[in-house]
Amino acid sequence: MSSGLPSIAATAQPSANGFSFNNGFPPFGIYYSQLPPVNSNGSTPNSSNRFKVKRHRQRVDAGEPRNTYQGASTSVSSNSSSSSSTSNTNSTPSSSSTSSKKSTEGMTETETMTASIEQEKVIQNEESEAGKDGMEEHDDGMNDFEIIDDTNDEVEESEERESPESNSSSASKRKSFQPQKIGEELGIEFGDETEQINVTVGGTEEAEETTDEAEGRELSALQAQLQNGHIAEQQRRFYAAFLDQQRKQVAAAQILHNGKINIERLVSSVKGDLVTNFMKDLEKVIRDWAADEVLKQEAAAPPQIPQPPPQFHPIFPANPLFHMAPPHHPVAGGGIFPPNFNAFNAFNALRRNLQDVDTSSEMKKKRTKVEIKKEDAMSSRASPLSASASPPLSRFFPAPTMVGHYGGMNFGDREDSPTNSDELSECGYEGGGSSSMLTPMHLRKAKLMFFYTRYPNSNLLKSYFPDIRFNKNNTAQLVKWFSNFREFYYNQMEKFARQALAEGITDRNDIFVSKDSELFKVLNTHYNRNNHIKAPDRLVFVVQETLREFHDAIKQGKDIEPSWKKTIYKVINRLEDQIPDFFKEPNFLERLET
């Protein structure tokens, strides 16, 4: 079995002490004439004049893992042999003269290097073929191999520090470059932690530098492309973030603006509600407080006996003969003066007549027909001098005390028309002829006529009251009634118009009136208490327009003027309607009683 050594090295006979060769090697004298002596550990004696061996990591381009020769005993590290051979070939000798013993050792080392060169060529061919296959895995495994190399370097350095067989430094041990196979054949034991040395010189170093420069240029171009793309991406992200921030700010400003509008509307509505509720509560509290105060004062005050009204006016002097008995006793029988005549008691008769009227109003009796028989009429006229037939003389001849005084009551006051109230409307209507006195039934009729006309003239009123003999007094009284009707009507309109403004109604078109409205019910109760007739539909429109006119006037601040209602009066005056003809019927007042 061939040992793999050159023929010259194979024919050499070992000496007794190991590897001394007595014969020289003339063929290699040309190349190694100035070969420096080698120490026992493979290093030159002058370490300052030698080249420092540069340690490189195994290139991944070769496609082989690091230290492959350690797995097989027959393989020899190509990089180690090549590096050792090239290093020794190009090394500069430190001295021109060496001893023969040292020259013999140099020749032995030269043979070893020659065998390593041949073995290197074979391995390089194999590595070149394997490198073609490994180029495809270069990009994916670059980072992994670098990590593995760093780890192996650390392990190797730690092993070198911990190995007891190491007699020299790590750098000198790397220079031993003795292959494992040659050491085994020659009987030389190397440590288990033999390291692979990569020394690149000459053309190999230049090729590697060229490859590194190409890779550096490619890497620089790739980094530039990646950097430019990264800048563009950063710019795109910056602009996107800026636009997103602007959109958020605009949306936040819009939300704030809408919230401000909503808050202002809420504040205005809350303010209006608070003012309205406060006024209502204040009125209620004041009204309750006033009622309580009145009740307390009445409870604390002593009971008072009602005093009868004075029989004479306060400025009239008292009559000393008022309570005295008549100077003569009543005489039975007739005469010029009836027996019940009392000249000093005329006011008692007047008071009795007034009490009779009050009693009749309290009884609220219905109107009944009075039937007078002929016999009764004849009997009443049979004895004209009888006491029952002749009326009291005080009715025809009033006493001096019955004459009206300053500030007192006149006799004509009893015959005037009643007031605006129809409280005496249940007394009945005494029809059957014309009269100059206005009754409560006439007042009720006038209120119903107000549904159609608010400003009637005197001629129109006379045509709808045919049973009244009009004179100056009752005509003025009838006109006064309608004036009072209008006053109540406009007061209600002003009240509800201010209430609508307090509720926040600012547009007149938002005001609507129907027969179910509170305002219309108040008016109908006042003018048509017993619902004798159905309220006309036209009245709803008139009430609505009146309320709107008051609303606009108060809203514009015209109510501060003294005569601000005159404009409204002119508008309402144009809304007059025709009064129905059934108001002229003679029995219309009788229907009002039912």
Swiss-Prot record:
The keyword Amino-acid biosynthesis does not apply. One of its GO terms (biological process) is glial cell development. Residues 136-162 have a biased composition (Acidic residues). This is Homeobox protein prospero homolog 1. Keywords: Developmental protein, DNA-binding, Homeobox, Nucleus, Transcription, Transcription regulation. Transcription factor involved in developmental processes. Controls the transcription of genes required for excretory canal formation. Disruption phenotype: Lethality at larval stage, L1. Surviving animals do not develop into fertile adults. Animals have abnormal sensory function with their bodies harboring lesions and signs of progressive degradation. Defective excretory canal formation with down-regulation of genes, including exc-5, ifb-1, gck-3 and aqp-8, involved in this process. Seventy percent of L1 larvae do not form excretory canals, but have a large vacuole around the excretory cell body. The remaining larvae form impaired excretory canals that rarely extend beyond the pharyngeal-intestinal valve and do not extend to the somatic gonad. InterPro entries: Homeo_prospero_dom, Homeo_prospero_dom_sf, Homeodomain-like_sf, Prospero_homeodomain. The gene is pros-1. The lineage of its organism: Eukaryota, Metazoa, Ecdysozoa, Nematoda, Chromadorea. GO terms for cellular component: nucleus. Residues 73-101, 379-389 have a biased composition (Low complexity). It comes from Caenorhabditis elegans. Residues 435-593 are annotated as: Homeo-Prospero. Residues 494-593 form the Prospero domain. It comes from the Eukaryota. It is found in: Nucleus. Belongs to the Prospero homeodomain family.
